[in-house]
Amino acid sequence: MRKNEKRNGKALLPIVVFVVLYLGLGILFEYGLDIEMGFYKIPVVVIFLVALLVACIQNRELKLNDKLEVMGIGISDPNIITMIIIFMLSGIFVGIVGRTSANSVAYFILSLVPPQFAVVVLFVVSCFVSLAMGTSVGTITLIVPIGVAVARVSGFALPVCIGSVMSGAMFGDNLSFISDTTIAACNGQGCEMKDKFKENFFIALPAAIASIVILLVLSVKNYNGGFIEEKYDLIQTVPYILVLIGGIIGFNVFFVLITGILSGSVIMIATGMIAPTDLIGNMGTGAAGMFETSMVAILVAAICALIKEYGGFSALLYWIKKVFKGKKGGLLGMGLLVGLMDIATANNTVAIVMANPIAKEMSKDYGISARKAASILDTFSCIFKGILPYGAQMLVAVSAAASLGEVVSAFDILPMLLYPYMLLLSSLVFISTMKVTDGRQ
């Protein structure tokens, strides 16, 4: 198949179409037509399908069969397959344990700490779990149901609880040694993981501390004392405890989720909470709840494969390299580069992989060390991916909440994503105060 290596900014049109339709319809529904939860009413799969059709119509020099082959290669990426399997397993897990188990976990956690600090606990627990598991999506899958239950019983707004979970998940995703983003950034830039971790740590730690302080202030100001202590069944907390321990230890996310599924099934049947036939039905219902999320991942992969084939990403990379000058400018350029890739691909690992070659070339041109380049790529991919309304993290969080009977919009959660915003501020301070020397930094 013929490769199109030329730079073609018009190839980015599908992304523009998606953003215009998604935001435009959302604003129209929410504010123009005054539809409750207007953004949540938007069929995101249909919007992505329209964007895919636009991508297919472009570049008439390429035959349809060749375009289908390009899309097939993009969809078959191991990261996409892994993501979809995680989606399915997480849906099955939620379908099995349901609301009752999540509520028991929430009451148990709140019995250990003052209820006004429950949101801070959600953030810290998510940090540790994500750091150990190396996956923000897996962490969100495990902790969001607990956050939903905490919101129900503590009086805190649901977006605050979910935002705290997502923030903590992005902390670990950025720093974990076993995170796909860490592996991709270090391998692409040619540095040791421990060196990248040291660079990252001094950017991430101030952001995490600032997030905790803000959450503490919000907790004290907004807690209304509405928590009513209720009884909880410790046996129902076992599936969540097992997956939490597995995550903290650092077991593979597949193993952790399968453990939760098996333990939840045994406990639900043994305690008479559900009949075996109903359990199987709940598994199917839970998996079905993740179908839309999985379809989004597939469509995004197909769209991005075509954009890359047409030369859209090459044009984007060329523009960034041309605009930013100097070492500090080079670091900012790297950050914007991977951020734009994140916006375009909705996959931070893919964004880093795509940005790696040009970032490595920029490192040579600007005299930037491999460990610093890897740190910036991973950090900014975390920032942008953490706040994407159509990213996997947000989609999983919203889907998990919906599967538990709670309707929440991505735009309700966005203002509560404190850590990505603090991480952006910390990164900008780090770059602006960096001492510039003639050596390689």
What are these regions (language model features)?
Residues 10-24, 34, 38-60, 81-89, ...:
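Hydrophobic mid-bilayer segments of alpha-helices in multi-pass membrane transport proteins
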Residues 83-94, 114-146, 321-360, 365-366, ...:
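Hydrophobic alpha-helical transmembrane segments of multi-pass integral membrane proteins
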Residues 1-26, 58, 62, 66, ...:
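Long, contiguous bundles of hydrophobic transmembrane helices that form the permeation core
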Residues 4-7, 30-45, 73-78, 109-114, ...:
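Interfacial loop-to-helix junctions that mark the boundaries of transmembrane helices
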Residues 124-136, 167-173, 245-251, 303-305, ...:
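Transmembrane alpha-helix interface/packing and boundary motifs in multi-pass membrane proteins
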Residues 181, 188-209, 327-441:
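C-terminal transmembrane helix pair
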Residues 41-49, 56-58, 67-101, 116, ...:
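Core transmembrane alpha-helical segments of multi-pass membrane transporters/permeases
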Residues 76-83, 107-125, 151-161, 230-238, ...:
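Membrane-interfacial loop-to-helix junctions in multi-pass transporters
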